[in-house]
Amino acid sequence: HFDVDTIILDDGFQHLGLKRDTNILLFDHQRPFGNGQLFPAGELREPKREARRADLVCVTRYSGSNYPPGIGEQVSKGMPIVKSTLRLDSLLKLDSNEVLEAKNLRGQPVAAFCGIANPEDFRRILEQIRARVVDYHPFPDHHEYTSADLRAIEETARRVGAKYILTTEKDAVKLNPNSFSLPAYKVSLDMEILEGREVFNRHVLN
């Protein structure tokens, strides 16, 4: 019905019965194998040796240093590797989708909250645009917000003098757009390919 010609499936690598054209395997640059244990004892869905099935490896949250130990040993020789990071794309007001330019947050006191797997990533991105994070509340991943949570967020934000409340797109979809009386914005993030864009395009777009 929507004339779709490409389907991207999250967590599809370990679904061996799935017919696919390209296997893209993501490694977190900070913790590529977690604690090295398989689920439920660790974060791995399959043994590390199965990385050799990938057609392309994408190192996420790349910080400019060398690869962490182990990635090179687990992937096939000559496998293309792409390096990427997250960047702030836009800020949209929760109740109107009005756009706020990132430069307007420079030096401004903000309160932020999120319920994502790597909450420090969100804080780091806010600090990169020079926002002054005066309150930061990370909730558990996939957190379902209660009215008490939201009241506490706003009360703390007002107490510490925040002018804005910020959250992620992932969290914003769980909120009533009118949850806050302070100006509240959802932060849209974009993946930036630092190295290997041509390789990525060749595998994904061709």
Spans of model-derived segments:
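Short, charged/polar "capping" segments at the starts of alpha-helices
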Residues: 63-71, 120-121, 172-176
